[in-house]
Swiss-Prot record:
Catalytic activity, as annotated: Random endo-hydrolysis of N-acetyl-beta-D-glucosaminide (1->4)-beta-linkages in chitin and chitodextrins
Top EC class of this enzyme: hydrolase
PROSITE patterns, per the entry: GH18_1, GH18_2
Limits of the GH18 domain: 42-348
Entry protein name: Chitinase
Keywords (A to Z) from UniProt: Carbohydrate metabolism, Chitin degradation, Glycosidase, Hydrolase, Polysaccharide degradation, Secreted, Signal
Pathway: Glycan degradation; chitin degradation
Signal peptide: 1-29
Domain of life: Bacteria
């Protein structure tokens, strides 16, 4: 299949040059040509694994499912593909489908796009060390655009963790790169989606994600804090005179509500994320994360309801991951789309 546009082999010279050097071909259009616009829409976000399950890969020795992208539960209207990272031959992160040709994978993306579902490229992940340096902006922008034109991605999710968040010049290079890409597609009347999924302790003033958020203000579409795998970290709440920890199942509603309220207003020691750009990140089940799983659906539904009553309805929910949502526990019992089934009604 021919691509929508041809990306030159030589570096583009400026932000303006991006539009000038890309020459349209006469390729027949497919649904992957459509850049799905999620502006103003509620989202249920489910990450997709770009690798085969090896079995017993869960925190409780369960097994994640191996899925084609097109097999992701249709309740997930935003599907980040995990992950874009360095292939070891260059600093510039890249992506390749693990089990399909470029043409076949593009057809998978096209199927989701035809259903009005956005497919993002997730940058990083827990085991990816990305270290860009000043001057990489244009080369990285070129690669992202090449990925979009090759596979039909609708945007990019910043999913940097650990040392990769601040490595090299990432905090300045990545936002500058994404502005180039977003402006390039804006010139075509399209919305290149930019999202982030930081672990929530990095959302404090002076913490590692502050630069990304402030630099991309006006450019990002939503932020989905990972409210899991952080043990006893949490938030002090004066109103109830209690430290509310992420790992405290007895106070799960209080954690979800007050963490959301803190982020919406930029209080209790956290940065501000507008309510219409806030997506809560939760694990699909106990195998998907070491802590943070919500045992019953009630605390999540109650949080959504109370925030709406406060006049601060939030954007939606995110989970790690769509593959885990249809995985199995250690005894071989299917998780049977528990997350999608429980929460899809909250984003309608």
């Amino acid at each position: 299949m021919k691509l929508k546009k041809i990306i030159p082999a030589f570096p583009l010279l400026s932000t303006v040059a991006v539009g000038l050097w890309l020459t349209p071909t006469q390729a027949s259009a497919d649904a992957a040509d459509t850049m799905v616009d999620i502006s103003g829409k509620k989202v249920l976000v489910g990450y997709w694994h770009n690798w085969a399950s090896k079995g017993r890969d869960g925190y409780k020795q369960g097994t994640s499912a191996s899925l084609n992208l097109s097999e992701v539960n249709q309740a997930y209207n935003v599907v980040p593909v995990s992950f874009m990272k360095s292939d070891g031959t260059t600093r510039i992160p890249t992506f390749k489908p693990y089990n399909q040709t470029d043409t076949a994978f593009r057809q998978e993306v096209a199927q989701l796009n035809s259903q009005g579902r956005a497919v993002l490229l997730a940058l990083g992940g827990a085991d990816a060390h990305i270290q860009l340096v000043k001057g990489d902006e244009q080369a990285f922008a070129n690669e992202i655009i090449r990925q979009v034109e090759t596979y039909g991605f609708d945007g990019l999710d910043i999913d940097l963790e650990q040392l990769a968040i601040t490595a090299g010049d990432n905090q300045t290079v990545i936002p500058a790169t994404l502005k180039i890409v977003k402006d390039h597609y804006r010139a075509q009347g399209k919305n290149f989606i930019i999202t982030m999924a930081p672990e929530f302790p990095y959302l404090k003033p002076g913490a590692a994600y502050e630069t990304y958020i402030t630099s991309l203000n006006g450019y990002y579409d939503y932020i989905a804090p990972q409210l899991y795998n952080q043990g006893g970290d949490g938030v002090w709440v004066d109103e109830i005179m209690t430290w509310v920890a992420q790992s405290n199942d007895a106070l799960k509603y209080e954690f979800l509500y007050y963490m959301s309220d803190s982020l919406i207003h930029g209080t209790r020691g956290y940065l501000q994320i507008p309510n219409d750009k806030l997506v809560l990140g939760l694990p699909a089940n106990r195998d998907a994360a070491g802590s943070g799983y919500v045992v019953e659906a009630t605390p999540v539904a109650k949080t959504f309801d109370q925030l709406a009553k406060d006049g601060n309805p939030i954007r939606g929910l995110m989970t790690w991951s769509a593959n885990w949502d249809v995985g199995q526990d250690v005894n071989g019992k299917s998780y049977n789309n528990e997350f999608a089934t429980r929460y899809s009604n909250l984003v309608k």
